[in-house]
Structures are given as structure tokens and as C-alpha cells.
């Protein structure tokens, strides 16, 4: 579902020191995306990729700080409510690798890249329904999410 051009919510983008990537209309949970991106924002790019690999392997949970109603605590010292959003982690990893390749194409040092902006926005709802008995129907909608990542080469 391509809708043409879009703009990033990140302001003051410097093309000399920064690279960016985005995923549009992804069929992943907006709530899990917000929680996961909060966790990787501010990380070095390579550390974030390792963290996402651990989430996909269900070794490290993602802390749920906002959307945590009836959420079980996860093992670990002082760890509260958390989950393993594997589907979201795979999608975010793809976008991070895209940002890494974009930075490499610009000639930036990929070992010094830091995630300075990671945001998730709700996308359009894909409407569907399930036919029920006696001519009724139950809505069966699917949420979509827009994700944007900006990385910056930090100076030594």
C-alpha cells in the first residue's frame, strides 16, 4: 500500500553526518514498536543489532513501560513487566540494516553510528471481517505501523 512521498518527523537532518531509513505500512503492532524503539534509542548501531538478535532468540526481554497492563514480570535482577516482540524485532532489524547500508553508501564509519531518532507511528488500519452466524459479521482489522530511524556518526 504505497502512498507516494512522505516526510520524517525528525528535524535538523544533517546529510553530512547522518543517515536514515524507514519502514512504511508494516504489519506489526504499534504498541510493541513504541516499546522496542524506546529501548534501542540512544544505543550504538551494532549494540542495537545484537540486542535485537537476543530479543528474536528470546534471550533478552523488552521492558514494557507504557503498554503493560496485566503483563508478567520477566526473569532478571530488578526486571519488571516485559515481552519478546519477535515480529517487531525482525522488522526493526531490517530497517536498522537499511540505515547502516545507507550510512556506508555515504562514506560514514559504521562502527561509530549512534541511533539518535527512533519513532513509531500508527499507519492505516487494514479492515477485514469474519462472517458469523445469522448473517452477522465481526470486524477483524489489522494495525499497520510506520517506523523511522536516524543514525549519526559520533565524533571522537
From Swiss-Prot:
Keywords of this entry: Ribonucleoprotein, Ribosomal protein, RNA-binding, rRNA-binding
Keyword Ribosomal protein: yes
Cellular component terms per the entry's GO annotation: cytosolic large ribosomal subunit
GO biological process per UniProt: cytoplasmic translation
Family annotation (CDD domains): Ribosomal_L22
InterPro entries: Ribosomal_uL22 (IPR001063), Ribosomal_uL22_CS (IPR018260), Ribosomal_uL22_euk/arc (IPR005721), Ribosomal_uL22_sf (IPR036394)
Cysteines joined through disulfide linkages: none
Single GO MF annotation: structural constituent of ribosome
Pfam families per UniProt: Ribosomal_L22 (PF00237)
Keyword Transit peptide: no
Family to which this protein belongs: Belongs to the universal ribosomal protein uL22 family.
Role description: This protein binds specifically to 23S rRNA. It makes multiple contacts with different domains of the 23S rRNA in the assembled 50S subunit and ribosome. The globular domain of the protein is located near the polypeptide exit tunnel on the outside of the subunit, while an extended beta-hairpin is found that lines the wall of the exit tunnel in the center of the 70S ribosome.
Assembly mode: Part of the 50S ribosomal subunit.
Name recorded for this polypeptide: Large ribosomal subunit protein uL22
Originating species: Thermococcus kodakarensis (strain ATCC BAA-918 / JCM 12380 / KOD1)
Amino acid at each position: 500500500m504505497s502512498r507516494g512521498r512522505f516526510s520524517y518527523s525528525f528535524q535538523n537532518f544533517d546529510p553530512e553526518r547522518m543517515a536514515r531509513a524507514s519502514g512504511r505500512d508494516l504489519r506489526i503492532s504499534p504498541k510493541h514498536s513504541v516499546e522496542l524503539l524506546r529501548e534501542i534509542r540512544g544505543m550504538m548501531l551494532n549494540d542495537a543489532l545484537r540486542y535485537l538478535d537476543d530479543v528474536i532468540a528470546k534471550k533478552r526481554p523488552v521492558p514494557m513501560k507504557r503498554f503493560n497492563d496485566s503483563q508478567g514480570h520477566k526473569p532478571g535482577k530488578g526486571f519488571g513487566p516485559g515481552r519478546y516482540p519477535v515480529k517487531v524485532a525482525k522488522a526493526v532489524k531490517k530497517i536498522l540494516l537499511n540505515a547502516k547500508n545507507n550510512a556506508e553508501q555515504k562514506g560514514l564509519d559504521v562502527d561509530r553510528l549512534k541511533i539518535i531518532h527512533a519513532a513509531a507511528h500508527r499507519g492505516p488500519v487494514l479492515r477485514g471481517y469474519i462472517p458469523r452466524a445469522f448473517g452477522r459479521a465481526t470486524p477483524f482489522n489489522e494495525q499497520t505501523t510506520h517506523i523511522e530511524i536516524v543514525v549519526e556518526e559520533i565524533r571522537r
